Amino acid sequence: MPRSNERIQDESSTSTRRDAGGLRAALERPAALIHLDFAPKHRQPHAGRVLLATLASVAGSLAADAVLVIIGVALFPATKGYVHFRFSDYGKLTVIGVLIACAAWPILTRVSSMPRWLFFRSAILVTLVLLLPDFYILYLGQPTDAVAVLMVMHLAIAVVTYNVLVRLAPIRPTR
């Protein structure tokens, strides 16, 4: 017959296993809904292609931003000289955001059996979150026309980055 201390330890370890099993079961359904399964049947993009796509995403996003600023100032002349339209202002934020997205793509290809599906939805969610500061500066009284251009810039960055990454650094089939 086991001593009382042994019985308490056995019950404690059984309880811990049960709790961990309950947590695992609770996380399995949400993970399955977003295809976060850690069992992809494909190979990750080639590292060189990811690097190329990263450079192209940064360049394409900065170019899109610059063009949108030019269009925005042409459409709304009162926005000329707007502080957030300076390359030094939007450029560093664009580069940081694009680099984060470019780092996320190979990670998602490793943890998801449907990385394009998950990356697309992640890009939408992140873009919506990144619009919040724009709404805040609009609330603070920044010019509506200028803030609208900033919002379009966010959308352009998301479109450029997503498309460049999934096309220039696609997942590879299994061997």
Question: What kind of region is each of these model predictions?
Answer:
Residues 52-62, 155-175:
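Membrane-water interface at the C-terminal end of transmembrane alpha helices
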Residues 1-17:
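N-terminal acidic, proline/glycine-rich, low-complexity intrinsically disordered segments
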Residues 61-70, 98-106, 131, 158-163:
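Transmembrane alpha-helical segments of multi-pass membrane transport proteins and ion-pumping complexes
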Residues 106-127:
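Internal alpha-helical transmembrane segments of multi-pass membrane proteins
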Residues 50-55, 78-89, 109-114, 172:
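Short juxtamembrane and helix-loop transition motifs at transmembrane-helix boundaries
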Residues 87-100:
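Interfacial helix-start motif at the membrane-water boundary
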Residues 132-149:
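Membrane-helix boundary connector in multi-pass membrane proteins
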Residues 21-73:
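N-terminal signal-anchor transmembrane alpha-helix
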